[in-house]
């Protein structure tokens, strides 16, 4: 078992019954010229987040944790995005940006596009699971819940973008399904002002889960590995 120092208190978990979830580390969300950038959100400080996710993934994989990668987006016809009868049609900033800038139509979050692809620095490995998702929450219209339950996984460690949107949405839905959710704060990034990051982390540690950081996470896993060897 591994005990992770976190806010508001430490949490103990079995790495082999825990998944590291990497949320939407796509060009759309982390690269200049991607959807968030074109929609007016600041992505200039995402490089350290990418590096921290690399570190967390390496440590988690070495500890025997399942790695799950999410990619947010839709089919080329945007049927999966929902039409005017869906609130997603009205609230998705990607869809609104394409309606406001017709030259971008078909380029944002389209499966198979550069925008949809994971950033070059973060590549899934054999044994990892890559899941497409059509909405903010990774539990909506995906097999995530059945994958986790079939493997006896009850603890989820979250990284990725955006903390206040897809990360928090997935963690909240997991909370309602009886999963224990931990966010590594320096391996996440918000969409919007810095206060959005702080507010999301406050919500998580106060109401829905736990908050830690990459160095603490890696140290905890390393200590567990040494204990097994001894």
From Swiss-Prot:
InterPro entries cross-referenced by the UniProt entry: Isochorismatase-like_dom, Isochorismatase-like_hydrls, Isochorismatase-like_sf, RutB
Induction statement: Up-regulated by the nitrogen regulatory protein C (NtrC also called GlnG) and repressed by RutR.
UniProt keyword terms in alphabetical order: Hydrolase
Principal EC category: hydrolase
Protein's UniProt keywords contain Transmembrane: no
EC number: 3.5.1.110
Active site per database record: 24, 133, 166
NCBIfam families, alphabetized: RutB
Stated family: Belongs to the isochorismatase family. RutB subfamily.
Protein name: Ureidoacrylate amidohydrolase RutB
Originating organism: Escherichia coli O127:H6 (strain E2348/69 / EPEC)
Gene: rutB
